[in-house]
Design a protein with these regions (language model features):
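Structured alpha/beta or helical-core interaction and ligand-binding surfaces enriched in interleaved
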Residues: 1-156
Length: 156
């Protein structure tokens, strides 16, 4: 799939709704009482490309369970529409050329299978959830023993 085709299958959520979705996600799935949450995530720092945080939300996920990537395919066969967003990082810290295909604070709504087919167009650390806000799946940029480090939280 080419980027243009992928973009034709996604809905970019408006800014106000993006903020609401992110805040609801954080309230549901992120341990905001962790001692490092405030300095790493809540307090944004000034960079040449705007205000960004330093850490990764997945470091503060409540009740994380490690899952393998095939689990995402299983879920995609059952759940059709999802949201996805990524960490708000600076180009000063992400040194991969042409990394951002969408805005840093963007939230997308799309078919789960389409997301999996087009994930090369997304940042490496992605947070996937649906309207129920009862579960999340996370793909990180890390790997453990040659397997991508993926997490789930909630009931799915």
């Amino acid at each position: 799939m080419e980027l243009k085709e992928f973009k034709s299958h996604v809905k970019i959520i408006d800014r106000e709704s993006c903020d609401t979705l992110r805040n609801n996600y954080i309230n549901c799935f992120v341990n905001t009482t962790h001692s490092l949450y405030v300095p790493q995530i809540q307090i944004k720092h000034k960079f040449v490309d705007g205000l960004c945080y330093l850490g990764y939300l997945w470091d503060y996920i409540k009740n994380p369970i490690i899952v393998e990537e095939p689990f995402f395919d299983e879920v995609a066969s059952k759940i059709k529409t999802v949201y996805v967003f990524w960490d708000i990082h600076s180009c000063e810290r992400i040194l991969i050329k042409n990394y951002w295909k969408f805005g840093k604070e963007t939230v997308l709504k799309l078919n789960f299978q389409t997301l999996l087919e087009g994930e090369d167009f997304l940042p490496e650390d992605i947070y996937i959830f649906d309207d129920s806000m009862t579960w999340t799946l996370i793909k990180t940029h890390e790997d453990i023993q040659g397997k991508r480090y993926c997490l789930k939280s909630g009931d799915i």
